[in-house]
């Protein structure tokens, strides 16, 4: 950061802000995320570099606002993302379920199902389990279902293997709820400690 300020290197400074914003987004620290992403946006908005950051910035903001319950802001950010890939459709389906917009959620479930049928998605177990998990969330009292616990543990393993920590972090609350409701208290404690340790490392 010091070198960027001394040299007046706008791109390097914006990249520093973006990385900080992304680190806070990874652990759902929405206020700090917003501070750094807004700095990124202000620096780059009128430059040719903005397109390089814009889509990732709005996706991360939308996903984080979704995680902390700021649903209208989440929808606004996610609607600014142009490419309808699996992860965006997953977040939009999840958000519309929480908002009670069944028709809109079904639209994105259909797109996810279609995307998962493509050859290039064949080996992506994390995405398949994310889709199955969200389908199960539509059922009443799903965290008390032993089948859900089995699914979420398979998802945990897939996310650890295939994705960054932020993907696992987004499920922390529902995982802990499932463990607690099904009296898996030791597993709940172990998972909570694992998340806490990685969160501290992510924000150092």
Please give the residue ranges for each predicted region:
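Residue signature of alpha-solenoid helical repeat architecture, marking inter-repeat boundaries
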Residues: 11, 51-52, 83, 122-126, ...
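Amphipathic alpha-helical segments of tetratricopeptide repeats
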Residues: 1-6, 38-46, 76-84, 110-120, ...
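Structural motif corresponding to the intra-repeat A-B loop/turn of tetratricopeptide repeats
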Residues: 7, 27, 68, 99, ...
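Residue register of alpha-helical TPR repeats
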Residues: 15, 56, 87, 94, ...
């Amino acid at each position: 950061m010091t070198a960027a300020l001394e040299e007046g290197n706008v791109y390097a400074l914006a990249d520093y802000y973006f990385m900080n914003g992304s680190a806070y987004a990874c652990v759902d620290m929405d206020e700090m995320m917003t501070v750094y992403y807004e700095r990124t946006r202000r620096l780059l908005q009128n430059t040719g570099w903005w397109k390089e950051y814009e889509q990732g910035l709005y996706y991360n903001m939308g996903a984080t606002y979704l995680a902390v319950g700021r649903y209208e802001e989440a929808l606004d950010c996610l609607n600014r993302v142009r490419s309808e890939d699996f992860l965006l459709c997953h977040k939009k389906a999840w958000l519309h379920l929480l908002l009670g917009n069944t028709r809109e959620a079904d639209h994105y479930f259909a797109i996810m199902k279609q995307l998962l049928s493509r050859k290039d998605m064949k080996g992506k177990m994390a995405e398949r389990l994310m889709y199955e998990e969200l389908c199960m969330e539509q059922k009443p009292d799903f965290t008390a279902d032993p089948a859900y616990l089995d699914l979420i543990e398979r998802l945990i393993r897939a996310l650890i293997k295939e994705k960054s920590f932020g993907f696992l972090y987004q499920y922390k609350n529902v995982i802990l709820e499932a463990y607690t409701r099904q009296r898996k208290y030791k597993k709940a404690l172990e998972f909570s400690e694992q998340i806490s340790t990685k969160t501290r490392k992510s924000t150092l």
